[in-house]
């Protein structure tokens, strides 16, 4: 009976999409409650500047994305709204932070280890009298 009432409010075709949306909103709500449980200053004190930037960017992106969804649910085209430009601006900064993170993770040359590796990898002939005699014999002919 309750299922029949639901079908009167919206088309049956979108029931699965609405259920998924409701589930996603519940997950977002849980995450926001978790984030809000800790004071922002307390959270940022535990992080290095790069991690702080990541938290700020993810927060800004999340809020703007939620506003994008809100606009869409109100029948406003978010692609024509300034929120699209704001999301692009945040993406640019996220890419910059990613580049910095990747540079930090990039392999660094350990000169001592490289020197030892090259030294041990190069072939050195052993000092024996036989190869010298063979070489002398070849050079005379």
Curated annotation (Swiss-Prot):
Induction: Up-regulated during adipocyte and myogenic differentiation.
Family: Belongs to the C1D family.
Annotated region (Required for transcriptional repression), positions in chain: 1-100
Function comment: Plays a role in the recruitment of the RNA exosome complex to pre-rRNA to mediate the 3'-5' end processing of the 5.8S rRNA; this function may include MPHOSPH6. Can activate PRKDC not only in the presence of linear DNA but also in the presence of supercoiled DNA. Can induce apoptosis in a p53/TP53 dependent manner. May regulate the TRAX/TSN complex formation. Potentiates transcriptional repression by NR1D1 and THRB.
GO molecular function annotation: DNA binding; nuclear receptor binding; RNA binding; transcription corepressor activity
PANTHER family: NUCLEAR NUCLEIC ACID-BINDING PROTEIN C1D, SUN-COR STEROID HORMONE RECEPTOR CO-REPRESSOR
GO biological process, one term: negative regulation of DNA-templated transcription
Pfam entry (one): Sas10_Utp3
GO cellular component: cytoplasm; nucleolus; nucleoplasm; transcription repressor complex
Subcellular location: Nucleus; Cytoplasm; Nucleus, Nucleolus
Disulfide bonds: none
Region (Interaction with NCOR1 and NCOR2): 100-141
Subunit note: Monomer and homodimer. Interacts with NR1D1, THRA, THRB, NCOR1 and NCOR2. Associates with the RNA exosome complex. Interacts with EXOSC10; the interaction probably mediates the association with the nuclear form of the RNA exosome. The homodimeric form interacts with TSNAX following gamma-radiation. Interacts with RAC3.
Region called Interaction with NR1D1, residue ranges: 50-100
Tissue-specificity statement: Kidney, heart, brain, spleen, lung, testis, liver and small intestine.
Organism in which the protein naturally occurs: Mus musculus (Mouse)
Swiss-Prot/TrEMBL keywords: Apoptosis, Cytoplasm, DNA-binding, Isopeptide bond, Nucleus, Phosphoprotein, Repressor, RNA-binding, rRNA processing, Transcription, Transcription regulation, Ubl conjugation
Protein name: Nuclear nucleic acid-binding protein C1D
Modification(s) after translation: Phosphorylated by PRKDC.
Domain of life where this protein originates: Eukaryota
Crosslink (Glycyl lysine isopeptide (Lys-Gly) (interchain with G-Cter in SUMO2)) position: 119, 126, 132
């Amino acid at each position: 009976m309750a299922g029949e009432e639901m079908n009167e409010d919206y088309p049956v075709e979108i029931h699965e999409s609405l259920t998924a949306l409701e589930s996603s909103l519940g997950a977002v709500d849980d995450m926001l409650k978790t984030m809000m449980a800790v004071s922002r200053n307390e959270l940022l004190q535990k992080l290095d500047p790069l991690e702080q930037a990541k938290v700020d960017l993810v927060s800004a992106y999340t809020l703007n994305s939620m506003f994008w969804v809100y606009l869409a649910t109100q029948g406003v085209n978010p692609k024509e709204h300034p929120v699209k430009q704001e999301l692009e601006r945040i993406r640019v900064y996220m890419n910059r932070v990613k580049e910095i993170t990747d540079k930090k993770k990039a392999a660094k040359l350990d000169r001592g280890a490289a020197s030892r590796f090259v030294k041990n990898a190069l072939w050195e002939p052993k000092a024996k009298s036989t190869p010298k005699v063979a070489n002398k014999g070849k050079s005379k002919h």
